[in-house]
From Swiss-Prot:
It is found in: Cytoplasm. Homodecamer; pentamer of dimers. It comes from Mesorhizobium japonicum (strain LMG 29417 / CECT 9101 / MAFF 303099) (Mesorhizobium loti (strain MAFF 303099)). GO terms for cellular component: cytoplasm. This is 3-methyl-2-oxobutanoate hydroxymethyltransferase. Its EC number is 2.1.2.11. The active site is at residue 189. One of its GO terms (molecular function) is magnesium ion binding.
Length: 286
């Protein structure tokens, strides 16, 4: 059954997300394309145009392959494909770290060129100034603490956070700094479960967990991981709700066989002369 085109602006805004603290868990997924946004929009509260797009769709080894132009292009596609979900666009590495002024300029460009509801950036105490400046400019901003994909090269890989008293204290400081700076919510990624749960209890803005805790105020996964489309190793925290790898591989195998034995295209997939509909997409022949 075809998904209806979005026709009415009934967007969930950042303020509504903020008010969901402690309520029914927020449902969040990444989206990078128009058709996927259309399919997900009726079921989620928030769509994140994550810089993971550089890995998932563009084949880069890390999220550092994302550029501002790339994020804007995918943000535009997701906005076109959705009508209800709050759309948040990641600020890629290199677009905000240098100064508050740089962060505001990049955030404003993202919002102006996509129409998205908010932006997201990585970092806690060290990025509080950037978060505060973006929020002061009237642009809703989501924080991101814990495992920071943009810092994996500096950190020596994807390391779980919160294993020592020192790192637990640092995570709590990051969460409080993000909250105080004016973020409307914060992603907590790749932490010890009890630490994420404690942070959730101690701060007043919603926490969105990914490899964190079921006690977070919401959960997010990369869409390709969730539907079983990821072709490389899938993180432990992912639950696959479908197996699109097999669906696509089997469809390609069947298509190849039918092309080679000339059973495709069949009579119903070609135009039969004067009685053919003039509509390329089909229609009754008369």
């Amino acid at each position: 059954m075809a998904t209806k085109l979005p026709t009415t602006d009934i967007r969930i805004g950042a303020e509504l997300i903020r008010r969901r603290k402690g309520g029914v868990p927020l449902v969040c997924l990444t989206a990078y394309t128009y058709p996927v946004a259309r399919l997900l929009d009726p079921h989620v509260d928030l769509l994140l145009v994550g810089d993971s797009v550089s890995m998932v769709l563009h084949g880069h080894a890390t999220t550092l392959g994302a550029s501002l132009g790339m994020m804007i292009a995918h943000g535009q596609a997701v906005m076109r494909g959705s009508a209800r979900a709050c759309v948040v666009v990641d600020m890629p590495a290199g677009s905000y770290e240098d100064s508050a002024a740089q962060a505001v300029a990049s955030a404003r460009r993202i919002v102006d060129e996509t129409g998205c509801q908010a932006v997201k950036l990585e970092g806690g105490v060290d990025m509080a100034g950037q978060i505060a400046a973006i929020a002061a400019a009237g642009i809703p901003v989501m924080g991101h603490i814990g495992l920071l994909p943009q810092s994996v090269e500096k950190d020596g890989g994807y390391k779980i956070k919160g294993r020592t008293d020192e790192t637990v204290a640092a995570l709590m400081a990051d969460a409080r700094a993000v909250e105080k700076a004016g973020a409307f919510s914060v992603v907590i990624e790749g932490t010890i479960e009890a630490v994420a749960a404690d942070i959730t209890r101690r701060i007043a803005i919603p926490t969105i967990g990914i490899g964190a805790s079921g006690d977070c105020d919401g959960q997010i996964l990369v869409i390709d991981d969730m539907v079983g489309l990821t072709v490389d190793r899938v993180p432990k925290f992912v639950k696959e709700y479908a197996d699109l790898r097999s669906v696509i591989a089997n469809a390609a195998e069947r298509y190849a066989a039918e092309v080679r034995d000339r059973t495709f295209p069949g009579p119903s997939h070609v135009f039969s002369g004067s009685k053919a509909s003039s509509d390329l997409n089909g229609g009754d022949e008369s």
